[in-house]
């Protein structure tokens, strides 16, 4: 690739589903329940960067990912069908691209996501929705001597939460409405394990240089998701970026900038530009002013928007 690295390496992006940062121990040290034991421990590694002020641009999967995966966002008014995607930019940078999804390919609801996914060199969907670890064996077909860009699209904590994890992950139980919250925590616990497996395999077998995880949007367990009464928690999402020591050595400015920006505010429709930054590409399809990985990043609480561009993030946060 033209990004300064001559050695074969892999970059992994994991897209979560309905994971809400306020329910994740790694982002909330005062939480008594450790819903993220792997990440809680992994964040003590200086190469693992957690971003505490990441938010979803929308409260539903399609409008969120239609923007996260492409140049189009709620700030530049570009149209989805006129933009490059993260897979396009990775291909231009010399990567073999993979898309592994545990979200159904059929139905009108995922069309823009499927359009992007199908441009991968290899795109695989699980046969039917199963537990997310069904995707892990797909990693075995990847050649560590290639430059690989891999996207995982998890089913994560999609309702109904108790269908998202095997019984062995049922750590919390509660009656009634609180039962949904317990099930939700269990689903996050299982996702944490899936992330651990991807991370370990990438590091041990694929020369992993970077791993990014974020969610499409959050969730409000026990609360009906309605656009008019949507609880603010639905916009609070996790974001982490792992950078290997060799990556940091070769891309010192990007690495230092991301370390400096862990407290910066970010909405996930800016994911495309973050990925461009991590790939360290030079392209007229990369707006550095919209990249959390660039010193030119121009966003903060005063000019970010959520709820499909209709609400200032600053106003939204008043209703925590």
Model feature map: region roles:
Residues 88, 105-106, 200-205, 221, ...:
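Membrane-interface soluble catalytic domains
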Residues 67, 172-180, 251-257:
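Short glycine/proline-rich turn/loop motifs
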Residues 65-66, 236-239:
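Small-molecule pocket liners
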Residues 1-2, 136-140, 172-214, 241-243, ...:
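A long, amphipathic alpha-helix that forms part
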Residues 1-13, 18-172, 267-268, 273-298:
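Active-site-proximal alpha/beta segments of enzymes that process anionic O-linked groups
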Residues 137-138, 224-228:
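Alpha-helical scaffolding within the catalytic cores
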Residues 15-19, 212-218:
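DG-centered beta-turn motif at the end of beta-strands
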